[in-house]
A protein has these predicted regions:
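Positively charged n-region of N-terminal signal peptides that target proteins for export
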Residues: 1-4
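Cyclophilin-like peptidyl-prolyl cis-trans isomerases
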Residues: 6-12, 19-179
Length: 179
């Protein structure tokens, strides 16, 4: 009888937790970044940068990133995108974001917000680290990480700007079809 009570108690606690928003939001925090080079899955890190994650979701919902080129791709460093003008000088119509620096290191596959010299100037541009770039730690906002498809990021044409730039086909939330 004691075992039955223990099992009942265990399942009455675990089952509701597994249906809680925390578990649901894990699915919501994965985005599909469809590039001209292939599909990349990214995990948004709202535990590190909630305002930046909110902005990325907002812009993705508006299809802001669709067909935007990678305008700055430095071999052994990073691939930058998110500027609708393709020059590195543009952004969205939304106000710039305050920095959300964290101790999270910039490693291969880390995604950070690009900005000007002013720490609170991030808007829509972001970069994906092609290699570790720990010299950026605590100077740029980490808001996501590549969890699948890094080979497609590696295949992005290099240059500032590249002669034939690769681009974002679309950015969207992951759904069950993406599993």
């Amino acid at each position: 009888m004691r075992n039955i009570i223990c099992l009942f108690t265990f399942f009455s606690i675990i089952l509701p937790l597994s249906l809680s928003p925390a578990f649901a939001s894990e699915k919501e925090s994965v985005m599909i970044l469809e590039l001209s080079t292939g599909i990349v899955k990214i995990r948004l890190r709202d535990d590190l940068a909630p305002k930046h994650v909110e902005r990325m979701k907002q812009l993705a919902d508006l299809k802001f990133y669709d067909n935007i080129i990678f305008h700055r791709v430095i071999d052994g460093f990073m691939a930058q995108t998110g500027d609708p003008t393709g020059t590195g000088m543009g952004g969205s119509d939304y106000p710039d974001l305050r920095a959300e620096f964290s101790p999270e290191p910039f490693l291969r596959g880390t995604i950070g917000m690009a900005r000007s010299r002013h720490p609170d100037s991030a808007n829509s541009q972001f970069f994906i680290c092609l290699e570790d770039a720990e010299f950026l730690n605590r100077q740029y906002t980490v808001f996501a990480e590549v969890i699948e498809g890094m080979e497609h990021v590696d295949a992005i044409a290099k240059g500032e700007p590249p002669e034939k730039p690769d681009y974002i086909v679309t950015m969207r939330p992951a759904d069950t079809d993406d599993e």
